[in-house]
Amino acid sequence: MRIILITGISGSGKSVALNALEDAGYYCVDNLPPRFLPQLASYLAEDGQDRLAVAIDARSSASLDEMPAMIRDLSRAHDVRVLFLNASTQSLIQRFSETRRRHPLSGSTSHDADVGLLTSLAEAIERERELVAGLAEFGHQIDTSNLRANVLRAWVKRFIEQKDSGLVLMFESFGFKRGVPLDADFVFDVRTLPNPYYDHELRPLTGLDKPVIDFLDALPVVHEMIHDIEKFLVKWLPHFRDDNRSYLTVAIGCTGGQHRSVFIAETLAARLASSANVIVRHRDAPVEAGESSKLVA
């Protein structure tokens, strides 16, 4: 059975990810107390289910301490993958304010004595970060601070389409003006390259459009940058694989995350597709009008 565990910070998009998995045919359970996970997996396997997705939050903090060992045990019999969703505190506060939902640890005394009384939203968020921090190392971390809900759904779809084993390598384009992604393992700054933004015909386009591709592809300095990044990754990917790393996020940043970083992320992904399970995400590139720009808890 393939088991996908969705955890992380409340408000970072766990419900969006779980809904995407349900649409993909997974048996989904939200807010399952972690101690019941092995029994649920066994029951569903006996019942013929082959795909399970479970969202876990910090309300059962005592059980969270048991999760690392539980994940290792489950991995012996099942294909277990962990998605750890994160976001900046500022983004989370804004989302809870917009949706008028209460944080699970905010405003009341938890049944867990370790949590106690948390009166402010910011305090609850920081406490939750402490409670779930130990799970981050088991899965792929994704920063949803500037991520639209439709983009997260598409990313989850690509994630579950990856092969059962091997290193998952994600290339993430972004704009420095909106901050560096929290989930990045490596960050490459390509702002020194010529910027298509200053060509008025190219300005409204992205690095996925042929005119921008042709513009950047004609510049030797762009190919030098791509070659150097590729050479670095080709050298070090085997070491990460030998270290049992399952996920590696390579962030490519330009000023706005629209032209140069998008083109280079796509090019690197194509070149390294045979070396790892590759996923591409464009955090800040414009999307079609009308798509949702909000995530829910």
From Swiss-Prot:
Residues reported to bind GTP: D57, A58, R59, S60
Gene3D superfamilies the UniProt entry points to: P-loop containing nucleotide triphosphate hydrolases
Pfam families named in the record: PapZ_C, RapZ-like_N
Function statement: Displays ATPase and GTPase activities.
Family membership noted in the UniProt record: Belongs to the RapZ-like family.
NCBIfam families for the chain: PRK05416.1
Protein name as annotated: Nucleotide-binding protein Bphyt_0592
Species annotation: Paraburkholderia phytofirmans (strain DSM 17436 / LMG 22146 / PsJN) (Burkholderia phytofirmans)
Lineage: Bacteria, Pseudomonadati, Pseudomonadota, Betaproteobacteria, Burkholderiales
